[in-house]
Design a protein with these regions (language model features):
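Vicinal oxygen chelate
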Residues: 11-20, 46-49, 64-90, 106-111, ...
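Amphipathic alpha-helical segments
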Residues: 22-36
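Short acidic/glycine-enriched loop/turn segments that link adjacent beta-strands
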Residues: 41-44, 102-106
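A short acidic/small-residue loop/turn micro-motif
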Residues: 63, 102-103, 123-127
Length: 145
């Protein structure tokens, strides 16, 4: 196995394709409470941020249709129930209330205007290996590389 370099990854940012970036920016800003920085006039790219979480939006070509029906992004928060209540008050369509999962997270999902499924989750008992990984890696199993 090749050794891992000493410099750590800092963060990741999902990049979501959008058919109408103006509508998507408005949804993320007005409904989900993110700040937006845009590029182009009219915008063709945006980076949205709330706290330390960033999500990018990219205007997709008219002939491209690529939407995952699984999670497009999983965003970790400190209080998932409070966030759910905030989004409920903002009128966000919420398919179900937060649920506690077997992988030690409490979560709910929203669909953005392009059908991207965005999950918001709270780690219930933090593990040094990261959310969900402690149960699978380290104690009696090895990470796959």
């Amino acid at each position: 196995m090749t050794p891992t370099p000493d410099y750590p990854f800092i963060r990741s940012m999902p990049v979501l394709d959008c058919s109408d970036i103006t509508v998507s920016i408005a949804f993320w800003r007005d409904k989900l409470g993110f700040d937006a920085a845009t590029w182009g006039e009219p915008p063709t790219f945006a980076i949205l941020q709330r706290g330390t979480v960033s999500v990018a939006l990219a205007l997709m070509p008219k002939d491209k249709v690529a939407v995952s029906h699984n999670w497009a992004a999983y965003l970790y928060v400190k209080d998932v129930d409070a966030l759910y209540a905030e989004y409920e008050a903002r009128g966000v369509a919420l398919p179900h209330p937060p649920e506690t999962r077997v992988y030690n997270c409490r979560e709910f999902v929203v669909d953005d205007p392009d059908g991207h499924v965005i999950a918001f989750g709270q780690v219930l008992n933090p593990d040094p290996l990261g959310p969900g990984l402690g149960a699978r890696i380290g104690r009696d199993q090895k990470a796959v590389s």
